[in-house]
Regions:
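C-terminal alpha-helical "lid/dimerization" subdomain adjacent to the S-adenosyl-L-methionine
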Residues: 9, 20-22, 64-66, 175-245, ...
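Conserved class I S-adenosyl-L-methionine
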Residues: 1-52, 87, 94, 118-123, ...
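Local beta-strand N-terminus motif with an aromatic residue
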Residues: 51, 141-142
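A short glycine-rich, Lys/Arg-flanked "PGG" loop and its adjoining helix->strand segment in the class I
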Residues: 158-173
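Short catalytic micro-motifs in class I SAM-dependent methyltransferases
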Residues: 149-153
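A conserved beta-strand element that flanks and buttresses the S-adenosyl-L-methionine
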Residues: 146
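Class I SAM-dependent methyltransferase SAM/SAH-binding core
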Residues: 52-130
Length: 256
């Protein structure tokens, strides 16, 4: 992500969770990916007796992280904005840390590993080691990688997807969510004063499907998971209270 975007997220981290649109987008994302998580978890449990290891790239303040955490063994939560990671760390270090999880409020921070890093290498030493007795050795790989509202900030999506591919175990999957580029109106997802660090105004569905296949993903599926009604009143020609529906894509794929 661009440095201008990182600075924006650093500045907004303390108040990020107070944004109703952010909360609603996260809730809808979790509702859409929860069945994917559960299916993978059941499959791994039945074949190995173990629970899922998950990587979330662009975790922000952990709104999605803390919903996913009760469903998995561990979730490594990565974000390049130190303000966001500091906010997540403050949450999980608070004894009363409570988020709305899969079946209601619970303390679910024990298995969250925050990492402040712009992740560009599957062997980045900031990631947990595969072997705890060899901290400088190969990095752990993951059963599932999540990323929510991140891809429209990424300059080189091919390289980004390649990094995610390299972070998966064989048979591991990605479930990536972001708003769709449905035409000229998609620019209104962000207010005019928050376009710094925005690389594209949504993700074109067919283009994304083709790109994932080119990177090497199999069993690729890119589909609309939900629509978010978002305020667009700050744009020229709009009236106070005006909203627009933004379709969100769920982008799935597996590493062979």
């Amino acid at each position: 992500m661009a440095s201008a975007g990182n600075q924006r997220f650093n500045d907004e981290a303390a108040n990020w969770d107070k944004n109703p649109s952010v909360q609603e987008a996260t809730r809808l994302a979790f509702d859409s990916i929860k069945p994917i998580i559960q299916t993978l978890a059941e499959r791994k449990q039945s074949t190995t007796g173990a629970r899922l290891d998950v990587l979330e790239v662009g975790c922000g303040t952990g709104l999605l992280t803390l919903r996913v955490a009760p469903l998995v063994r561990e979730i490594v939560a990565v974000d390049p904005a130190h303000g966001m990671i500091q906010t997540l760390e403050a949450k999980i270090n608070t004894p009363t840390c409570q988020e709305i999880a899969a079946d209601g409020p619970r303390n679910n921070s024990h298995n969250v590993v925050p990492v402040c890093r712009l992740l560009e290498d599957p062997e980045d030493p900031a990631l947990p080691a595969l072997d705890g007795n060899d901290p400088t050795g190969r990095r752990r790989k993951f059963d599932l990688i999540l990323s929510h509202l991140v891809m429209h900030h990424v300059p080189d999506l091919r390289a980004f997807l390649g990094t995610l591919f390299g972070c998966l175990v064989p048979g591991g999957r990605v479930a990536l969510t972001d708003f769709e580029d449905f035409g000229p109106e998609a620019i209104k997802f962000h207010p005019p004063n928050k376009l710094d660090g925005v690389e594209r105004h949504g993700i074109p569905a067919r283009w994304m499907e083709d790109l994932m296949k080119e990177v090497g993903f199999q069993d690729v599926k890119v589909s609309v998971g939900w629509t978010l009604a978002k305020s667009v009143e700050l744009w020229e020609g709009q009236k106070p209270g005006d909203t627009l529906g933004f379709p969100f894509l769920v982008c799935e794929g597996a590493r062979p």
